[in-house]
Every structure is written in C-alpha cells, then in structure tokens.
Amino acid sequence: MAKKWLFSALLIAIAISLATPAYSQILRPAEPEIAAKAWILIDATTGKVLLERNADEQLPPASLAKMMTTYIVSNEIAAQRLQEDSEVLISDNAWILGGAKTDGSTMFLSPRTKVSVLDLMHGVIIQSGNDAAIALAEHIAGSEYAFADMMNQQAEILGMRNTEYLNATGLPAAGMVTSARDLGIIASAIIRDHPEYYEIYAKKYFEHNNINQPNRNRLLWRDNSVDGLKTGHTSEAGYCLVSSAKRRGMRLIAVVMGASSDESRARESQKLLSYGFRYYDTKVVYPAGEILKTGAKVWYGAEEFLNLTIAEDVTLTVPRGSEKNLKANILVSDLIKAPVTAGQELGQLHVSLDGEALVDIPLVAEKSIPKAGIFSQLFDWIILLFTRLLS
C-alpha cells in the first residue's frame, strides 16, 4: 500500500511539474485586424516596431503634416530665433487659404490682426487651424513655399525617407506624401526633443476669438493614458490619427492612415495601443554604470586589472514575460594597453532574444589607468613576448 501511495504521489508531482510551465507562459494572440490603408505601432523610447502594415507606402498626409510645422516652430524657439510671445501678423493669404470662409479646419483668425506664436501653436495642434499654420510658416520663412522647403530639409535630417512636403497645412497638393513609418519618426521627435510643447497635444479645448473648439482626437476622452498627438482628414487621405499613450513607464506611438471614419480611426488606434501595452514591455535591462566585466587585464598599466561598464542605460522592448530569455554575450579587446582613459571603448555587449540579435552596446573603461613605471612595463613586455612565442 505504501509503495502504491508513493507511486501515486510521484505521478502527481510529475504532472504538476509538467503543467506549471504552461500556466506561466504568456499566450500572445494573432495581430489585430486593422481597418485602414496603413499603420504602425512603435515604442517611443527604443524605436522598436511592434506591428506594421504598409508602413512605407506613400500616402497623403492631410493635417498630419502640421506635426512637422509645429516641430519646426519648436526648433526655432529652442534656438532663440523665435519667441513664444512674438506677435505674428495674420496675412490676407493665410485668411483666404485657411480661414473661416474655407471648408477646412480653422482657428478663425481675423486678417491683419496679430496673434502670439504660442497661441498659434495651440491653434495648429488643438484646432488643426490651417490659417494658423500658414501664418506661422509665413512669419518664419517669408512664404509657405519657402517653409515647405524647411520642412523637407528637416524630414531628411530625421530620416523620413518617404515624405515630401508642399505646404504647411497638409491641404491636398499633387505629390505631397508621407508614410506611417515617417509619421512615427516625427511623432517620436516631437515627444523627445520638445516635451515642453508636447503637453499642448493633450489639451482637449482651445478658445480664440470667443470660439471654443475641441481637440478632434477622440482618444483623449476615452483613455486617460493617451496624451497626443494629431488627427488628419481629407477625402483623398481618409481619416488619419497619430496617437501616443504612456502606461507603466512605457510610451507607445500608433499611426493609422486611411481609415473610413472619425470613429474608425480612433477605434483602430485603440486596438494597436491596447495590443502593445498588453503583450510588450519596455525595460532598462542594464542601467548606465553597471559593471558588466570585472578584472579585465591591463598591460603596461599602473594597475593590473580594470572593470568595464556601459555609459548609457540599455533599454529594450520585448514580449512580456520574455526578459528571462535574454542572452548577454560580452566580448573584450584581446589586448588592453595603458594608458586607458575612463569611458574608452574596450569591448562589446551583445544582447539577443531567442537567437535574434537585439542590440550591440560598447563596453567602456570604468576609470583611467596611466602607464606604469619603466621596469613594470619591461616586465609586461617580456611576459607578452613569451606568451606569443609559446602560443
């Protein structure tokens, strides 16, 4: 009887040990079906692409072009070539092409009046005002045409390979195109380079000329983690939305182009964000300054050994629960010779996940090591000589 109970207990133990890993695994469903012409989901910190479809297809940008307009304005302010409180004269041209008499989105600016740069930025970002975008373009570059050239130069600097700007508004123009991937790039740049102005994208209303207009980004009302960015719509482009949200310290950017309606672009964007936050994590796997290699041999130095570290955080975006499967491979220079300067690159950290290379990071000297005295150097030289002869 005792043997029978022992055998039964053993079977139960084996069954539990086999079943437990299945419960601990995170199941990831198929990618969500997105009803749009093109889309992409990226992590804003690491640039990791989580989902994409037709992300490099050139499509009309609609008002998403205004993201570059406000990015350049922010750059001009940061470079002190422009001030927030600078007064901008609203031209007849800005009023005619983008004002209240048009069918497009407008800030309802009055011609030949003056409005501050900061108010115009609010009008572009929140109200998607075409008149405000044209006024800013003319103020900075003299004409909207010249400003579009600045936009294209900036796009090239940022690596936006499939974008061509012809105006500051995104109003239809033959040959004016962008892509979902490029929109992810400019959104990342706005968040990274100008956080002081990014908060404008989260505002739900802005009032000018006693007219209070809502932000057209529906996700601002539906999801407290969403804090930007921009909507766009023309008959040619369809309904577009670049959105961003932050949860658990992780920021994602979703781009949806060519949806069928205002509701659809919000719904499809929410699908992307929800999928990304549920099934991915962005974490610092190695903090800056962490010692990753101890006792690296230093020849001809006043000290014999040196620690190697990393200069910046190693941040990765990986499927949730897969962090334990990360593999780190450390390669150190074959021969480290003094003098060594703190921060000098002396090796590489290779990180992979399930055989896929994720990142290569330089390993650097933790501190400086000067040359040793002449006799110590001679001693090391003799040891190295014999080592080479024997090998």
Descriptions of predicted regions:
Residues 4-5, 67, 247:
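Hydrophobic alpha-helical segments, especially transmembrane helices
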Residues 15-16, 78, 280:
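Hydrophobic alpha-helical membrane context
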Residues 3, 20-23:
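Protein maturation boundaries and topogenic segments
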Residues 22-181, 188-192, 209:
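Active-site-adjacent loops and short helices of periplasmic peptidoglycan-processing enzymes
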Residues 1-9:
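Bacterial N-terminal signal peptides that target proteins for export
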Residues 2-3, 61, 113, 117, ...:
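Structural motif marking the loop-to-transmembrane transition
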Residues 160-164, 172-391:
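Domain-terminus/edge residues, biased toward the C-terminal soluble/receptor-binding domains
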Residues 8-17:
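Bacterial N-terminal signal peptides
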